[in-house]
Design a protein with these regions (language model features):
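HTH DNA-binding helix-turn interface
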Residues: 1-10
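Hydrophobic alpha-helical connector segments
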Residues: 10, 14, 21-54, 105-108, ...
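Secondary-structure edge/capping motif, primarily at the C-terminal ends of alpha-helices
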Residues: 26, 55-59, 119-122
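All-alpha amphipathic helical-bundle segments outside canonical DNA-binding/catalytic cores
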Residues: 34-35, 73-74, 91-107, 125-134
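Phosphate/oxyanion-binding loops and surfaces in catalytic or ligand/nucleic-acid-binding neighborhoods
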Residues: 43-51, 77, 111-118, 138-146
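Short secondary-structure transition hinges
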Residues: 49-84, 91-103
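C-terminal peripheral helix-coil segments that are non-catalytic and often amphipathic
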Residues: 84-88, 92, 122-161
C-alpha cells in the first residue's frame, strides 16, 4: 500500500464484509425476532472483545473515508437488519404492532452508536458490552408485547446458566 489511508480503507471494507457474513450466518436458524436480537448482541460483543475502544474515535478523526464506509454500513446495512427484525417481531406478535418502524429502527442504530461514545459512557466507568446489554434490555422491553417480554425472560434465564 502506498499510503496508510488506503490500507485502513481496505481493512474497513474487509471488516464490513466479514461482519455482514457473521450477521447473516448468526441469524440462520434463530427461533424468532427476540432470539435474533440476542444473537446480534452476542455477535456485537464478540466483535468488541477484539476491538480497541478508541478505534471508532481514531477512524472518525484520522481516517474520514474509512469512517464514511462504517457509517454507510451502519446507516444502510444495519438499519435494514433492524427493520427486518422489527417487521418479523410484529408478525410473530412479539413486538407491539403500533410502533413506528422507521423511528424505532433509527433509534436502535443511534443506541448502538451511543454505546461507543466515550463522552456519554466512559470506558473507565462502563464496559461497552455492559452498555450495549443495558440499552438492548431497554429497547426490547419498550417494543415487546407481553408475549415478547416472556421470551426476554426465558432467553436471559438460559444465558445465565
Amino acid at each position: 500500500f502506498t499510503d496508510k489511508n488506503k490500507l485502513v480503507i481496505t481493512l474497513m471494507k474487509s471488516k464490513i464484509a466479514s461482519q455482514v457474513c457473521i450477521i447473516d450466518k448468526g441469524f440462520e436458524g434463530v427461533e424468532n425476532a427476540v432470539h435474533e436480537l440476542f444473537v446480534a448482541v452476542d455477535n456485537l460483543e464478540e466483535m468488541l472483545s477484539n476491538t480497541n475502544p478508541t478505534l471508532f474515535f481514531d477512524l472518525q478523526k484520522y481516517y474520514p473515508a474509512a469512517w464514511a464506509l462504517f457509517k454507510d454500513f451502519k446507516e444502510y446495512v444495519l438499519y435494514e437488519k433492524v427493520l427486518d427484525n422489527l417487521k418479523r417481531g410484529i408478525e410473530e406478535q412479539y413486538y407491539r404492532a403500533e410502533i413506528n418502524l422507521e423511528i424505532i429502527a433509527r433509534m436502535r442504530i443511534e443506541q448502538i452508536d451511543m454505546a461507543f461514545n466515550q463522552m456519554v459512557f466512559s470506558v473507565q466507568k462502563f464496559s461497552t458490552s455492559q452498555v450495549i446489554r443495558e440499552l438492548t434490555d431497554h429497547f426490547l422491553y419498550g417494543i415487546c408485547t407481553d408475549k415478547g417480554q416472556k421470551l426476554i425472560s426465558d432467553f436471559k434465564r438460559k444465558s445465565e446458566k
